[in-house]
Amino acid sequence: MAKWILLIVALLVLSHVPPGSTEFKRCWNGQGACRTFCTRQETFMHLCPDASLCCLSYSFKPSRPSRVGDV
């Protein structure tokens, strides 16, 4: 009987799934993700409210505004 209780307790403990970081906080109008480090395909744009980096894919990176003197 003790083995069955131990087995049930072990299965209950192992069935608990801790929350993962699959859902990143979004930034830059939903185009970027707040992370500790950006991947090679991403660039850092600004800081998120929790002081992590707002990583934005190079395809979504906005171009720099042109200055009047550059024309």
UniProtKB/Swiss-Prot annotation:
Residues 1-22 form the signal peptide. GO terms for biological process: defense response to bacterium; innate immune response. Gene3D superfamilies: Antimicrobial Peptide, Beta-defensin 2, Chain A. Disulfide bonds join 27-54, 34-48, 38-55. Its main location: secreted. It is found in: Secreted. Keywords: Antibiotic, Antimicrobial, Defensin, Disulfide bond, Secreted, Signal. One of its GO terms (cellular component) is extracellular region. Belongs to the beta-defensin family. Has antibacterial activity. This is Beta-defensin 25. It comes from Mus musculus (Mouse). The gene is Defb25.
